[in-house]
Curated annotation (Swiss-Prot):
This is Aromatic-L-amino-acid decarboxylase. L-tryptophan binds at residues 102, 203, 318, 348. Its cofactor is pyridoxal 5'-phosphate. Belongs to the group II decarboxylase family. GO terms for molecular function: 5-hydroxy-L-tryptophan decarboxylase activity; L-tryptophan decarboxylase activity; pyridoxal phosphate binding. Its EC number is 4.1.1.28. The modification N6-(pyridoxal phosphate)lysine is found at residue 319. The keyword Transmembrane helix does not apply. Homodimer.
Length: 500
């Protein structure tokens, strides 16, 4: 009784007053303040170090150990964001960010994210958000048309598509669908016979998703690639591996082909691989997370040759089509296989439209039940910019990558290690330019570059060769930025070789 009285007293003496978590005019005022902050951040992002200079654990020293009991004014919070959060950011928005693959952004996508957040709908079934469901179906068909995918991947045909969070989720869903199709024929005890194929260049999430789908770790085949195939999968090697597995009593289940590997943007020959997959009844998925976006340009569309024989395809507009994270598009040729594997139908979600099988319920196309109104930002991007400007954006990045490649080739101290397919350039200092071991001297150069704060690049090792990666693609990058990073590379190389 005493504790209840104390609470009542505390509440009656509270200075907070009536609590309204959302009040239109106050939101308008605060949102204007936040938009100004964001616009200023984008405007000035080049003045910040690209790679954060803080030490691990820095933030715990600056943030109180407990949450505030009483509310704090937005002005104080904004000051702390500038003082404590921004210094700890590796600035992916910087025009001098060339690491990994840049996460692209745009005004249209930001507005779409704002609207999606504001509406806050949860579109797990059609009835829970009809507009969210139907716009996603339309946008997925739009993008499929732009990519010149066959009708078998569209809702207007016999297939369909869904916007997932990431490529990992897309591949997990398709492996599960392939697994269920196989086990319906073979029986559940045969799961130990199922084999999945990728390459040693396939994204690291592939073995993880296979394991999550119940594939035995020893049954995950990562096909070795070589410089002779530009680190793409050799159809001959794949065929031999599949034939050996069949002879040993295994069941080939799933093949993940990649358009634009993370290390070097290597491309697997979809046309040839799909023929082998179809011959052996293997579900073939094309992971085009990065390079698939380039296929909206006619000059790159040939990378999708053979797509009519593929079972599923995914690409991530957040990598190159100006959409904020997260946004991955997954198309499947036979949606019923996905639905058979992933459908749930609890009593509390049942409704007349779903029961009559008249609508799409996207909860049955993904792992989770809940989902955002993800299609809004893609809809705004496509309408605000049109295909022509998206193609121009892709071509501009590729042109800057080609320009950087030419500068590298013109300097006799450097070499291009693997062919440039898109806007990523993989290069290194040659073995004979320094008394240091070739890997050591290239590591030193990368460390020197990143320590300046003026650029952020990463490395990879392919075929036993350590190389530097420069990935053009930030939404803010222009030709003069690429020119400046090359000037910086040359200057630091001069300094490094003098020391060596």
């Amino acid at each position: 009784m005493g504790s209840i009285d104390s609470t009542n007293v505390a509440m009656s003496n509270s200075p907070v007053g009536e609590f309204k978590p959302l009040e239109a005019e106050e939101f308008r005022k605060q949102a204007h303040r936040m938009v100004d902050f964001i616009a200023d951040y984008y405007k000035n992002v080049e003045t910040y170090p690209v790679l954060s200079e803080v030490e691990p654990g820095y933030l715990r020293k600056r943030i109180p150990e407990t949450a505030p009991y009483l509310p704090e004014p937005l002005d104080d919070i904004m000051k702390d964001i500038q003082k404590d959060i921004i210094p700890g950011m590796t600035n992916w928005m910087s025009p001098n960010f060339y690491a990994f693959f840049p996460a692209t952004v745009s005004s249209a996508a930001f507005l779409g994210e704002m609207l999606s957040t504001a509406l806050n709908s949860v579109g797990f079934t059609w009835v829970s958000s009809p507009a969210a469901t139907e716009l996603e179906m339309i946008v997925m068909d739009w993008l499929a048309q732009i990519l010149k995918l066959p009708k078998s991947f569209m809702f207007s045909g016999t297939g369909g598509g869904v916007i997932q969070n990431t490529t990992s989720e897309s591949i997990l869903c398709t492996i599960i669908a392939a697994r269920e199709r196989a086990l319906e024929k073979l029986g559940p005890d045969s799961i130990g016979k199922l084999v999945c194929y990728g390459s040693d260049q396939t994204h690291t999430m592939f073995p993880k998703t296979c394991k999550l789908a119940g594939i035995y770790p020893n049954n995950i085949r990562l096909i070795p690639t070589t410089v002779e195939t530009d680190f793409g999968i050799s159809p001959q090697v794949l065929r031999k591996m599949v034939e050996d597995d069949v002879a040993a009593g295994y069941v080939p289940l799933f093949l993940c082909a990649t358009l634009g590997t993370t290390s070097t943007t290597a491309t697997d020959p979809v046309d040839s691989l799909s023929e082998i997959a179809n011959e052996f009844g293997i579900w073939i998925h094309v992971d085009a997370a990065y390079a698939g976006s380039a296929c909206i340009c006619p000059e790159f569309r040939h990378y999708l040759d053979g797509i009519e024989r593929v079972d599923s395809l995914s690409l991530s507009p957040h990598k190159w089509l100006l959409a904020y994270l997260d946004c991955t598009c997954l198309w499947v040729k036979q949606p019923h296989l996905l639905l058979r594997a992933l459908t749930t139908n609890p009593e509390y979600l049942k409704n007349k439209q779903s029961d009559l099988d008249k609508v799409v319920d996207f909860k049955n196309w993904q792992i989770a039940t809940g989902r955002k109104f993800r299609s809004l930002k893609l809809w705004l991007i496509l309408r605000s910019y049109g295909v022509v400007n998206l193609q121009s954006h892709i071509r501009s990045d590729v042109a800057m990558g080609k320009m950087f490649e030419e500068w590298v080739r013109s300097d006799s101290r450097f070499e291009i290690v693997v062919p440039r397919n898109f806007s990523l350039v993989c290069f290194r200092l040659k073995p004979d330019v320094s008394s240091l071991h070739v890997e050591e001297v290239n590591k030193k150069l990368l460390d020197m570059l990143n320590s300046t704060g003026r650029v952020y690049m990463t490395h990879t090792i392919v075929g036993g060769i350590y190389m530097l990666r420069l990935a053009v693609g930030s939404s803010l990058t222009e030709e003069h930025h690429v020119r400046r990073v090359w000037d910086l590379i040359q200057k630091l190389t001069d300094d490094l070789l003098k020391e060596a």
